[in-house]
Amino acid sequence: ESVNDIEKLGSIMKLYRRLGCTESDVYFAAAENAHKLQPTSESAAGCAQMCIKKEDYAGAVEYYKQALTMVDNEEDKADYLYRMANVYVAMKNYQQGAAVAQQALDVNAEDGRCYLLLGICYASAKIYDDPILARSVFWVACDMFRKAKAVDSSCSSDANKLIATYSQYFPSKEDVFFHRDLNEGAPYRVGGWV
């Protein structure tokens, strides 16, 4: 009977969210039933989480798109965009992941998680055949990691780890010296969608 009681379903979702149990089958069932009865941004996001757990990433994107059409506050909007960007990254669609992470930053420019995600997307970009230029994406990725820790100190540890990981792949000074498109110390614009 409670599967048709929107108030009970909402209470269940609220309780499980407060307890940090949004990965439980009970939470998913409540979100799915609530979404069927009376769709809200919260129920759509709950259904998206269920899809992610089942690795139904296309379904998760669709539910996040629904959530975004119903959301009534900027904080949740930015969070849904961030989560949707993560889904695109899980799908290895880094270009779309970066685009959605940028949309999240347009809503909340202080969310360091989005800059970390942008950096990961850029580091995963395959935009050059040239082996030296292909590594130029790591410069931009590390710029994003630095930006993450500059705007959001809670991201500092993750940002520092990512910088340490990806900076080791920068083109060497010798590579830069011998490459006609690069000059040490000069600005360089990474092409493609990055």
What would you call each of these model-derived segments?
Residues 147-194:
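Terminal, low-structured helical/coil segments at or just beyond the last alpha-helical repeat
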Residues 17-21, 72-75, 89-92, 119, ...:
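Short coil/turn linking the two alpha-helices of tandem helical-hairpin repeats
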Residues 1-3, 31-40, 66-74, 103-108:
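Solenoid-like repeat scaffolds
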Residues 11-16, 30, 47, 67, ...:
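Structural register within alpha-helical repeat arrays
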Residues 1-13, 24-27, 36-46, 75-81, ...:
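Generic helix N-cap/helix-start motif at coil->alpha-helix transitions
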